[in-house]
Every structure is written in C-alpha cells, then in structure tokens.
C-alpha cells in the first residue's frame, strides 16, 4: 500500500503519518526515513521535536538525497518524512528535474508499504523568483505523480486528516 499525506506546515501531517505507520507495522518497528539536512538552528530544533515524539518506536534512517538507495530491499513499512525537504535538498544539490522525477518513480516501485509526507505548497501565490517557482512547480508535479499512483491520499488541515482518495 502506498499512502500520501499532504498539508500545510505544522498541519499535523507527521503526527497522523506516524500513527498510521505504527498501525500498519503490526507491532514491528517501522522505518522512518528522515530527509532533512540540519542547515540552521531552527531546523535542528524542528528535527529534535520530531525525534522526541518518535522516541524508540521507529528504526530511523537519515538520508537527505538518495532515498531509494537507502530503502533497497527494505521490508517496510516505511514512512518518508518528508518529500518537501527532500526536494529542497535535491534542488540545493542541483539534481536535474529528470533525476528528481525518476527518484519518485523508483520510490513508487518499492515493494513495501510506504507513507509519503509532503507539504502542500500550491495553495499560495505564484512565487516571484525563478528558484521558488521551480520548487513550487516540481512539488506540484510530485504531488500529482504520487496522487495518481498512491492507493490513498489524505489532506491534513488544522490537525484534521481528510481522505481525498
């Protein structure tokens, strides 16, 4: 099963994804693939908050760029947190659009159950600079790619999860 949970920043996506993946794991430790690179103190604090909430319930893998490689032969379930930060990393490291889309295609081919967490960035204004527009456009393409293939798609707003597929 492949599940997408999308929503705004601090909307409750991660909490819902963590609860769901634990249910899917049937008592085993699910894999938590963390994609964030610790580039500033504020981001470090966000990551620490996530680590505290997770505790010892997950097997954590930290990989900011090569997600499929980190998950090869994995016997899920896997929670990927989050594709928005991964996309940020990919653009920062100047991965081509083709490589970005191919990575998502490969993640969708994983045999194990996967929950993808991604911020919904397409509800605001069109950004005023090229890099921000590229980020928003690619994020939207990734969301569509996942939405088409995932068995279930959920939108989280104000801590409330709504299934939309």
Regions from the language model: what does each represent?
Residues 48-51, 78, 132-134:
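Short, hinge-like loop/turn segments at secondary-structure boundaries
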Residues 54-100:
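Helix-adjacent hinge/juxtasegments
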């Amino acid at each position: 099963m492949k599940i997408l949970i999308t929503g705004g920043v601090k909307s409750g996506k991660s909490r819902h994804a963590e609860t769901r993946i634990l249910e899917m794991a049937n008592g085993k430790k699910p894999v938590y693939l963390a994609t964030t690179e610790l580039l500033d103190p504020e981001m470090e604090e966000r990551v620490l908050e996530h680590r505290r909430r997770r505790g010892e319930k997950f097997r954590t893998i930290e990989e900011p760029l090569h997600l499929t490689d980190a998950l090869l032969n994995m016997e899920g379930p896997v929670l990927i947190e989050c594709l928005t930060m991964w996309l940020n990393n990919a653009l920062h490291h100047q991965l081509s659009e083709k490589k970005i889309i191919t990575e998502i295609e490969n993640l969708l081919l994983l045999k194990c159950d996967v929950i993808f967490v991604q911020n919904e960035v397409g509800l605001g204004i069109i950004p005023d600079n090229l890099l921000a527009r590229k980020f928003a456009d690619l994020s939207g393409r990734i969301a569509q790619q996942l939405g088409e293939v995932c068995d279930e798609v959920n939108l989280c707003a104000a801590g409330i999860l709504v299934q939309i597929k």
